[in-house]
Amino acid sequence: MKKLVSLCLALLLLVSLCGAVLAEDKPYAGQTLTISTFAFNAELLQKNIYDPFMEMTGCTIVADGASNAVRVTKLAEAAEGDYDVVIIGDMFVKQLMAEGKIDTLDTSKLTNLDAVYDNAKAPMGEGYGPAYTFNRLGIVYNPEDCPIEITSFADLWDPELRDYIAIPAITNTSGPLFYYGVAAAFGLEPGKDDDAIFAKLAELKPNVKSTYTSANNTITMLNQGEICAAVLLDYSYTTAKSANPAYVWVNPAEGLFGGYNMLNVITGSKNKELAELFIDFYLSFDLQYAEAMDGVDCPVRADIVLDEEHAQNFTYGEMVNQLILPDWDFVTANLPGWTERWNETFSVK
């Protein structure tokens, strides 16, 4: 009997020791990290990011996916502590910062930050989160349907494209980039020459079938032949080309207007240490490489080398240094006025 009791005690001790080891290996077991993120590529994000991070830490990830604009509203209305991390475009980071929704973070904990391109380390200032991918604005068109060859933003004004193109709404992630592109096409300057820029947009209106807020819907319009060309960010080209390999990507002659998608901690996060670990994980070599191989995001790590096939759709290599990046403080200050004038221009066909 004594031997049986001793054996049971030994087994209990072994189980408790195993539990202690597991707890030490996964110190975040039982914690839930709530992320506000994009709605697309959910399966690939689960495979490349969420599942490996949960396996590594023992935490549970809840990913709330929606468009940038919808998420800004949700975050503004959320109670403190409802969210931990926001993954969103640069223009919307500025809006959230102005509303006090973005917390600073301890960049000394980001062990992968040194491998990131300098202009992606702290785009919104020291103490705020890094970019995890670049993007650039271009034109996707179907040469089988399009009556002209397109090489520039200025080509979109060609009368042969009447009611045949899509452009981003000014409130879309790429909207301000297109505004800058229009200005460059005609030798104008945002802020200084707004009257002239909107006059050019009014001239473009007969060609515009859609001012979109959803890139996916715009690609559907391309596929159905409702439009022959669309102004899109580069990552949308991967989706478009998978539907029709004939689609052509154009780096506009006016230049590479671009920006970032970024990672930040939400003010009031109950899991800030875990949130910072997640942001660092997002910058890791294996994760960035996997995302690039799957055509999800271009890497911000300078040490990742892509073959021609995987690099062709991304803002990669020398292009990173060629990006024309808007002053987002300036854009944020002017966006309400631009939006009002945009709606006046495009609300009635």
Which stretches of residues belong to each language-model region?
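Short, low-complexity disordered leader/linker segments with a strong preference
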Residues: 1-33, 348-349
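Early extracytoplasmic/lumenal segment of secretory-pathway proteins
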Residues: 26-95
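Extracytoplasmic ligand-binding site segments that recognize negatively charged/polar headgroups
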Residues: 39-46, 82-83, 87-223
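Paired acidic/hydrophobic, glycine-rich loop segments that form the ligand-binding mouth/hinge
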Residues: 84-87, 211, 228-233, 249
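A ligand-binding cleft/hinge motif common to bilobed small-molecule-binding domains
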Residues: 92-95, 223, 229-246
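Periplasmic-binding protein-like
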Residues: 135, 199-204, 243-267
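Mature extracytoplasmic/periplasmic domains
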Residues: 257, 261, 266-326
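Conserved C-terminal helix/tail region of periplasmic/extracytoplasmic solute-binding proteins
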Residues: 324-349
